[in-house]
């Protein structure tokens, strides 16, 4: 039997939503509420392919949800709020408490709150959304879907840092990894496209957007990933540095007079592609600048690709080979230039990619390898919302 599931991503002043019909996985409507609690809030909803925008003051998440539900009825999307069978909520950090998604109870709410020190910008906002929905729709299941859960299958040798073991025991200092919902979705989809059991596949998933992470997925389980204790670690990103020598932090403090928080802000918001190029964090800008002969833009692209190269080589070694490489997220799905730079020189690994196919695929699903290539290369648009809806059906027992 069909049911309507809401996939929710609540920020501190925003609420993204998708209404999905399950198990068909068809999108009914989607939208975004911005500037919640700020003057001139913006409510946007897509109805029959047309975007409808309304500007009005929305004081909090509860009011935002009520406006969203009223809009569903007003546009004939639902007849009654009881048509909604369940809600699924993106939660950034589940720590070690949540190796899977979870049906939200008062105890689960408390546990999400207890993990807020691991994701101070996100978990409190995600929780605000959950609480508002539980209050307004008390008779349906609400499910929390964690960005970190998929990576909880990593073995100790992958997630432990070479620090005093007591730091892990006392403070939970370890690699958690992020983008898990995306990596899980594209790995499952890759197995479907290849018509092979996921248990037989070694997949390297490259989620490349403004934030980027690489994951080694062996038999459907994450065994390693590039992001760490926070999403700052790993490859070069739009404004994030990725991995650096930790001794640089006190050195930069000494040289610039900045405190630790200020240096951390530089690493998060002024580094990466923006830091190297000096002009932009957007790969599209850097690609056109590089074509015009701007050396720093080209350098930023080269550094970016080389860091991803390292992880592909490393993860192929960890899994004793690789069967498929997946590109996903904004850049991975749309930039043939970045894909080409990442794949260049990997023929020795059995990766033979077709430049023509690579050029033609943009924002759609498809193979970009030659038919004879032992390792397949697939572009797969990610769909975290469908993954959230699937887990809402599963854990909400719909």
From Swiss-Prot:
Record key words, sorted: ATP-binding, Cytoplasm, Kinase, Magnesium, Metal-binding, Nucleotide-binding, Transferase
Keyword Hydrolase in annotation: no
EC code: 2.7.2.1
Alphabetized SUPFAM superfamilies for the sequence: Actin-like ATPase domain
GO molecular function, one term: ATP binding
Catalytic activity: acetate + ATP = acetyl phosphate + ADP
Residues that coordinate or bind substrate: 90
Site (Transition state stabilizer) location in chain: 179, 240
Active site: 147 (proton donor/acceptor)
Cofactor (UniProt): Mg(2+); Mn(2+)
Residues reported to bind ATP: 16, 207-211, 282-284, 330-334
Localization: Cytoplasm
Function: Catalyzes the formation of acetyl phosphate from acetate and ATP. Can also catalyze the reverse reaction.
Protein family per UniProt: Belongs to the acetokinase family.
PANTHER family: ACETATE KINASE, ACETATE KINASE-RELATED
NCBIfam families: ackA
Subunit structure: Homodimer.
Protein name: Acetate kinase
